[in-house]
Design a protein with these regions (language model features):
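Charged, helix-rich terminal subdomains or tails
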Residues: 1-81, 85-293
C-alpha cells in the first residue's frame, strides 16, 4: 500500500512538474579544458609571472561552481582550466559558453606569440558535451564526453565546442565547430524546431543523402557540388513543416541550403547538426524555454 501511494504521489508530481509530458531521460556531461596552456606556461619567464598565472587559473576554477549552478547543473570537478560537470540539456550550451567567455576574460593578459604563424594566441577554453541516457553506465558516458572534448581540441585554432549525441539504442553522432559559429548555428536550428518551421524527417533524409553519396566531405562525393546542393534544396523544399500542416518557407530552405552551397558545412554535418538541434529543442520545449534562452 505504501509503495502504491508513493507511486501515485510521484505520478502526480511529474504531471504537475512536466505539464503532463514525460521527462526527457537524457542529460549532459560537460568537460572543458584550456587551449595551448603548455605554450602559455612556457612563456612565463619569472616566478612572479608563474604565480600570477596560477592565481588566475585558481580564480577561474573558483568561478566554475557558481556558473554551473546558475545553469542548474552540478559541478563535479574544477581544477585550473579543467572543468567537469553535469547539466540539463536546455542549459548545457549556454553554460559552456559562459565558462569559455569567463576563462578568456580572466586569462586575457597571457596572450603569446605563435612562432610558427607569427600570430597572437589568446587563451581560450574548448568544451565537449555528451548527451547521454540516464541509464547508460557512467563509465561509458565519461568516455563519450572525453571523446567530445578531444574532438573540440582537434579543431583548427581551437576555442571550440563539440557535442556528442548518444542514443540508448547505440547510435552516436558528433558535431563540432568554433565558438561563435557552431553555437550560433545551433541556436538558429533550435529556433526552427521550436517554431515548427522545419520537419524532423528532413534531417534524416539529408543523412540518407550523405550516406548515399558515400562521404562526409565534398572531396569524397562523386557528384558535382551543384547537383548535391540542388538535391539538398529539393529535400528541404518538399518536406512539410508544423507537423505536416504547411510548407517550409523559402527563407528557411534558402538559409539551410546556402550552408551547403557555400561549402561552410557538408551534407552530413548539416544533417547531424539538425538532428542534435532537434533533441535540444525538445528539452527547451519541456523546460518552457521556447522564448528565452
Amino acid at each position: 500500500d505504501d509503495l502504491e501511494q508513493a507511486q501515485k504521489a510521484l505520478d502526480q508530481f511529474l504531471k504537475v512538474a512536466f505539464r503532463g509530458d514525460r521527462p526527457i531521460p537524457y542529460y549532459v556531461l560537460l568537460q572543458a579544458d584550456g587551449d595551448n596552456m603548455g605554450m602559455i606556461i612556457n612563456e612565463q619567464e619569472t616566478i612572479d609571472e608563474h604565480r600570477e598565472l596560477s592565481r588566475r587559473l585558481s580564480t577561474f576554477a573558483q568561478k566554475a561552481d557558481p556558473i554551473v549552478t546558475e545553469y542548474h547543473g552540478c559541478l563535479i570537478y574544477a581544477g585550473g582550466e579543467d572543468v567537469l560537470a553535469l547539466l540539463p540539456m536546455h542549459t548545457a550550451i549556454l553554460c559552456a559558453k559562459k565558462l569559455a567567455d569567463t576563462f578568456a576574460q580572466d586569462m586575457a593578459d597571457f596572450t603569446v606569440l605563435d612562432p610558427q604563424t607569427n600570430k597572437d594566441i589568446r587563451p581560450s577554453l574548448s568544451a565537449g558535451l555528451a548527451i547521454v541516457h540516464h541509464l547508460e553506465p557512467l563509465s561509458n558516458s565519461l568516455e563519450a564526453v572525453r571523446q567530445a572534448e578531444k574532438y573540440a581540441k582537434s579543431i583548427k585554432g581551437k576555442n571550440a565546442l563539440a557535442i556528442t549525441l548518444t542514443k540508448r539504442g547505440g547510435s552516436e553522432r558528433t558535431i563540432g565547430g568554433t565558438w561563435g559559429t557552431l553555437d550560433q548555428r545551433l541556436e538558429y536550428f533550435i529556433d526552427l524546431f521550436l517554431k515548427e518551421d522545419i520537419s524532423t524527417q528532413a534531417a534524416y533524409e539529408l543523412e540518407t543523402l550523405a550516406m548515399t553519396l558515400e562521404g562526409s566531405g565534398d572531396d569524397n562525393y562523386y557528384l558535382p557540388h551543384e547537383a548535391i546542393s540542388a538535391e539538398v534544396r529539393r529535400i528541404l523544399g518538399r518536406k512539410k513543416a508544423s507537423r505536416g500542416t504547411r510548407e517550409v518557407s523559402e527563407n528557411v530552405v534558402n538559409s539551410l541550403s546556402d550552408l551547403v552551397e557555400s561549402k561552410k558545412i557538408s551534407v552530413e554535418q548539416l544533417a547531424d547538426e539538425l538532428i542534435v538541434a532537434r533533441e535540444l529543442a525538445s528539452a527547451y520545449r519541456l523546460a518552457g524555454k521556447e522564448e528565452k534562452r
